[in-house]
Each structure stands twice: as structure tokens, then as C-alpha cells.
Amino acid sequence: SEVPILTTKKLAWKTAIKELLWIWQLKSNDVNDLNKMSVHIWDQWKQEDGTIGHAYGFQLGKKNRSLNGEKVDQVDYLLHQLKNNPSSRRHITMLWNPDELDAMALTPCVYETQWYVKHGKLHLEVRARSNDMALGNPFNVFQYNVLQRMIAQVTGYELGEYIFNIGDCHVYTRHIDNLKIQMEREQFEAPELWINPEVKDFYDFTIDDFKLINYKHGDKLLFEVRV
């Protein structure tokens, strides 16, 4: 049950999970929804209408998949197919919509997931077009492993392999000094993530259903966000 999270600095892991819930559970593009969770990491991209445009949760919430004669969104379709058609090679979600890229405040960094069920285990491969190694990468790698655990739990599978692919990993010049400090720090054993085993519906998870056990980490390091 080890979780891939940085130990050389403190990661705001609850903030990361709240952002995950905002995108995947609420399927929201409304920054005000995130603000209600006391999270402000998207404030810089907030548009006049309070949203980030047609990005992230907006794409997951579009009812563009057909299921039993009805239109459903990507998340509901994925959950249904994993339970009812586990051997499919089409367990994919996609945030990269070429028709709507110009309507997004920020084009998605993590844009695709592909899920595999083998021998009773749920495997996940994530694809990111771009990852800021100081800020975005630690959040994203942790978040999508949490997502894998959540979906494995509600679909009845054991946890399988987790693969995170990055097209362009980059370091901004202004982050170099603090990253050098971070690289010299002691690393600690990975903590364990507890997820409330009573939750059986993906939409019932709340932030209170997650606990990091024995999370030892270095001091906080500040990195400027690029807008």
C-alpha cells in the first residue's frame, strides 16, 4: 500500500486529492467549486465566468458515450465497462479535445488514462504531454495513483501496476536553486495510503476518506507557479 509521494519536501496531499475530486468526481471546471474546498491552485487561470473554460472536468462531464441506449460521460462509462467488460482494450479517458482547445484556459497536461484488467488486478497507464518537475509532476503522480486505488476499490479489483508517461518533462530556471536543495535532502520510506474501505460508490468519496500513514518528509520548499 505504499504510495508514490515525495518525501524530500512536504506535499500538500489533501490539496492534490481535492483537485482530483474536483476534476474526476464533480467533473467541474468551476474554480469556485474548488475554492469552496479551500483550494486556490487554479485561481490564476480563473476566467470572468469563474471557470477554466472547457478544460479538465468539463471534458469528463460531457455526455458523449452511449450506454444502454443513453448518453453518459467518460467517468460513468469507464466505471461501467471496468465492471461489466473487463477484458476490453478500450478503457480510455481523454481530456485532449482538439475542437475545444482554444476554449480552455489551459490545455491539459495530463490528458489520457488507459486502464487494463488482468488476473483480477486493475492496471493504469497515464499520459502527460507536459510536466513541470518541481510542482506539477509530484501532484500528478500522486493524484492518479490515488485515482487508481479509488476505482480499483469500487470496481472490486486488486491494485495493479501504475505507469506514468511524460512527453516533455521540464524544469524552469527559477526552480533550479530549490530543486538542488531538494535533491540533497534525505529521503524517507514511502508512507501508506488508507482509503475508507466502506466506500463502494465512486461518488461517495470525500476528503475524510483518505489518510496518509507515517508520512515523513523534509521541510516545505516554495516554487513559483508559472502562469
Curated annotation (Swiss-Prot):
It catalyses: dUMP + (6R)-5,10-methylene-5,6,7,8-tetrahydrofolate = 7,8-dihydrofolate + dTMP. InterPro entries: Thymidate_synth/dCMP_Mease, Thymidate_synth/dCMP_Mease_dom, Thymidate_synth/dCMP_Mease_sf, Thymidylate_synthase, Thymidylate_synthase_AS. (6R)-5,10-methylene-5,6,7,8-tetrahydrofolate binds at D132. Its EC number is 2.1.1.45. GO terms for cellular component: cytosol. Pfam families: Thymidylat_synt. One of its GO terms (molecular function) is thymidylate synthase activity. It comes from the Bacteria. It is found in: Cytoplasm. Pathway: Pyrimidine metabolism; dTTP biosynthesis. Belongs to the thymidylate synthase family. Bacterial-type ThyA subfamily. Homodimer. HAMAP family: Thymidy_synth_bact (MF_00008). This is Thymidylate synthase.
